[in-house]
Amino acid sequence: MTRRILVVDDMPYLRDIQVLLLNDAGYATTAVGSAREALERLSDLAPDLILLDVSMPGMDGCQFLARLRAAPEWQRLPVILTTGRSVEDVARENRCDVLPKPFSEAALLDLVERLIGSASSGGS
């Protein structure tokens, strides 16, 4: 079964790059432009992992993550926060994996594979 990833980023060109890299690696990827849209579509999409921008207008990535972790069915869902801020600060505040921007294709795919396995694996 192909692993599903939800990309949440308000910058269209960054979303497109992330989707391209993940799709090329064999993952089934859906992208949305806001945390609110991600919350609305989460149950239907049932992702195996979320790649989440920290800095977005409206509800930011950290607020989204807090809501996600408050829901029992999503507490264990792997999340990678992407940020231009201090990685240590973001990781400490949110207790999850953080990928600093700009990031390389190798860094993205290595972290995704570490968390959920290869695109067609049953997990890590």
Question: What are these language model-derived features?
Answer:
Residues P12-T30:
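Two-component/phosphorelay signaling modules centered on CheY-like receiver
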Residues A31-E40, G61:
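Helix N-cap/capping motif at the beta->alpha junctions
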Residues E40, C62-Q75:
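Short amphipathic alpha-helix used as the core "switch/output" element in two-component signaling
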Residues L45-L51:
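Active-site beta3 strand of CheY-like receiver
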Residues D53, T83:
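Active-site residues of response regulator receiver
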Residues M56:
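Receiver (REC) domain active-site loop signature in two-component systems and cognate sites
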Residues F103-L115:
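C-terminal output helix
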Residues E113-S124:
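The C-terminal output helix
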